[in-house]
Amino acid sequence: MSANSLTSKLTWSRRFKDAAFRTSLTFSILAALGLILYIFYSLWRDSSFLLSSDLLTKFPSNDPDEVGFQSAIFGSLWVVGVAALVALPIGILTALYLEEFAGKRNRLTSAIETNIQNLAGVPAVVFGIIGLAFIARGPLSWGFTVGSAALVLAMMILPVVIIVAREAIRSVPPSYKDGALALGATPWQATYRVVLPNALPGIATGSILAVSRAMGESAPLLLLGALSFVTFNPTGLDSQYTIMPLTIFKYASDSREEFHYIAAAGSLILVAILFTLNLLAILLRDYTNRKNRV
């Protein structure tokens, strides 16, 4: 076999593998996109005739002509907002400590890292059981309130925030911090002024995605007494509440067909909220990238 023939066969083999890989990637992307578009279409088909401002301004009702999702929207925003206020600062500071100040790997940092990785894979319902035993009842006894639900969701998304923040901090070239230290900055100044701003796009994107996950959770909150029918908005951490997934489930399981269409409309509203959060993550990442380049 000549050298030219062997080279030709190797080139053809590489091209075939490259084409097969590109085709499989394209098919996977199109399949995922097609599934998402089909879900959107199904929700729109079943609920487009119901979409109006009344769904946002009215409270849940047993009358399909007077139904709305205001208390569910406000309840979700309260619970997820407070959870984010608790989890994001703690998660980012923990990531900074582990990556920038913990020093060489030791038993303490190894134990912390292992537990963080394990907690990230714990099912949501387990956090609900822990919250029921120690927060809603038990030592804290906060009851079935917004505060209990927010603290449980904060526990649930905290490992994700820490992992994402650590990856973002690792992506910053070490030379950036070394340059700041060489100019006389303290380790904290170099971290705060150089490392953190450059890691912020990744931290912000991952944090918002973690918050988006919390917005769609219902299993842990079922154990914490989240109601499915609430005709008032929460006013504080000690208020009772409902959330969008539970209200949607209530309408979807109703025997009357009208409420099935209302559930589809609620699902579309929830998807719109999640889409807005993801869009915010993209815009925030692009903004911080442009700001860092300037």
Can you say where each PLM-predicted feature lies in the sequence?
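Transmembrane alpha-helical segments of polytopic membrane transport and secretion proteins
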Residues: 1-29, 281-294
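Periplasmic/extracellular loop-to-transmembrane helix junction in inner-membrane transport proteins
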Residues: 4-23, 43-83, 105-106, 250-261
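Interhelical loop and adjacent transmembrane-helix boundary motif
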Residues: 61-63, 67, 221-271
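Transmembrane-helix boundary motif in ABC transporter permease subunits
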Residues: 83-116, 129-132, 137, 282-290
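Transmembrane alpha-helices
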Residues: 84, 164, 187-225
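C-terminal transmembrane helix and the adjacent membrane-cytosol boundary/short C-terminal tail
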Residues: 98, 166, 170, 174, ...
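Generic hydrophobic transmembrane alpha-helix motif, especially the helices
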Residues: 117-157
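Glycine/proline-centered hinge or cleavage motifs at structural transition points of membrane proteins
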Residues: 123, 183-184, 197
